[in-house]
């Protein structure tokens, strides 16, 4: 999505507020998703704004933060987001772990999305069980008072049976447009933005 908006001529930056699973690069922890967001964007923003919380172990972010003795704060994330908004026309925020994944012992990615008042683009890993999971997540997004702006069909299981039928069911039942259908191992081609 970041690359798409850059190609459309927007000053665009990606943000991953909380990331777990990082390696030392030039004396700082860097998560591979964050590196990809930086590469895709066209705004030279401070890494501390793009990724305010980063932890080395590839485990649930709230557990990684506890092990590091760090409390993830929605207010700090809001300040970083506001800083990015002052530098870019588009700030694309990537979650971690799913819509209801905890970021600390009291708050989840859903709370973060509500605080930042973000429209949501849901990524559906197309595999057995994805219909139920996607419909529950879409319902959870709406119950939080947020807009489900669209969804992406990410074909993560190249051997899935009845894949086209599953995607057709998702398109019929999710009350938002499918903005991309990503084949196994390919880059997304956006359908409807």
Regions found by a protein language model. Give the residues of each.
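Short, glycine/serine-rich, charged loops/turns that create anion-binding
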Residues: 19-22, 127, 156, 186
